[in-house]
């Protein structure tokens, strides 16, 4: 068992002259950005810049006593003692999945590719574990943490297992490139296509309750405002006007480091026959032509996987959801 990481604000520091403290963990600051030039970190630069910009208004709101949703937690691990330009050894981005901060997601956990070549560099597993445990330590109000890992990433799987995470769900990752010349499919009557707004957001919430597995639904503990905030105003619903019920929906979740957007597609269990032109229309409304959408499908949902394959989406491996 690794020794606990001691937290101080804004950094986790030991005696810099001690060989037992080869690196410091601290929250992301502006001066870190030029140091994050390792290939492992470059795809995250837009996200990191946006996080720093958003931290300013959140700080002002907090100073004025105004309640605001919690922002992302970004931690960096850097060399603690060096006579040269310090090297960033690792980076972690964690994000609350609801406004109350009861559930957090390990969105990114990356280690510098060049760090292994440095003399006396700490073990990569030690850096990763320290970042994860420090993030958990800095969010004492969190009840649950969620993390995903590729089924082929044995180091990440071992890291999660050693820190108490248990696999709960296996999903397949898909990437779909929206064709430039493909026309929008037609929508069958009597369903109505509506953009996601605060007025119809309760319909999305009821749809999520019907489609999300009960154990995961309890952990996520998402409310209407959580769904609206996470989508950033980018979402579409298919509504049955006779019942005033959303039978399918698609919304943004996050920008994907590989380009494009991660989206969530929900189809009511009683309306799986909509997998086809109707759900394709939802996805096409989310992004312009030529863009890329990233989706997850449960490995037990054969109908959805078959539809995505017919749509021309490419498989990008299996992802194991840990809680």
What are the functions of these language-model segments?
Residues 321-323:
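Conserved small/polar residues in nucleotide/adenosyl-binding loops
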Residues 139-149, 288-298:
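Conserved GNAT acetyl-CoA-binding A-motif
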Residues 71-79, 87, 93-104, 108-116:
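Active-site-proximal cofactor/substrate-binding loop regions of enzyme domains
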Residues 104-106, 132-136, 172-175, 261-265:
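Short, structured motif recognition centered on aromatic/hydrophobic residues
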Residues 151-169, 299-317:
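Conserved active-site alpha-helix within GNAT-family acetyltransferase domains
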Residues 118-137, 162, 272-287:
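Conserved acetyl-CoA-binding loop-helix of GNAT-fold acetyltransferases
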Residues 101-121, 258-271:
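Conserved acetyl-CoA binding element of GNAT-fold acetyltransferases
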Residues 5-92, 163-259:
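Amide-forming acyltransferase catalytic core, primarily the GNAT-like/NAT-type
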């Amino acid at each position: 068992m690794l020794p606990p990481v001691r937290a101080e604000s804004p950094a986790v520091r030991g005696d810099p002259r001690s060989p037992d403290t080869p690196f410091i963990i601290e929250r992301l600051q502006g001066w870190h950005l030029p140091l994050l030039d390792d290939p492992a970190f470059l795809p995250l630069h837009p996200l990191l810049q946006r996080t720093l910009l958003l931290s300013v208004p959140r700080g002002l709101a907090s100073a004025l006593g105004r309640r605001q949703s919690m922002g992302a937690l970004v931690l960096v691990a850097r060399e603690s003692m060096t006579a040269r330009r310090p090297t960033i050894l690792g980076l972690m981005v964690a994000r609350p999945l609801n406004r109350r901060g009861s559930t957090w997601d390990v969105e990114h956990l990356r280690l510098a590719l060049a760090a292994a070549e440095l003399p006396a560099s700490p073990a990569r597993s030690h850096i990763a574990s320290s970042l994860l445990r420090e993030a958990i330590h800095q969010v004492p109000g969190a009840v649950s943490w969620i993390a995903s890992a590729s089924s082929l990433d044995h180091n990440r799987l071992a890291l999660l297992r050693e820190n108490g995470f248990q696999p709960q769900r296996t999903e397949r990752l898909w990437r779909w490139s929206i064709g430039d010349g493909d026309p929008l499919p037609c929508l069958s009557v009597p369903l109505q296509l509506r953009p996601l707004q605060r007025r119809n957001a309760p319909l999305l919430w009821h749809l999520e309750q019907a489609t999300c597995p009960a154990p995961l639904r309890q952990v996520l503990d998402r409310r209407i405002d959580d769904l609206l905030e996470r989508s950033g105003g980018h979402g579409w619903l298919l509504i049955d006007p006779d019942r005033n019920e959303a039978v399918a929906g698609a919304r943004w979740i996050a920008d994907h480091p590989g380009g494009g957007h991660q989206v969530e597609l929900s189809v009511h269990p009683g309306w799986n026959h909509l997998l086809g032109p109707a759900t394709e229309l939802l996805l096409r409304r989310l992004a312009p032509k030529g863009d890329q959408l990233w989706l997850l499908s449960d490995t037990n949902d054969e109908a959805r996987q078959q539809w995505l394959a017919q749509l021309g989406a490419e498989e990008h491996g299996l992802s194991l959801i840990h809680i």
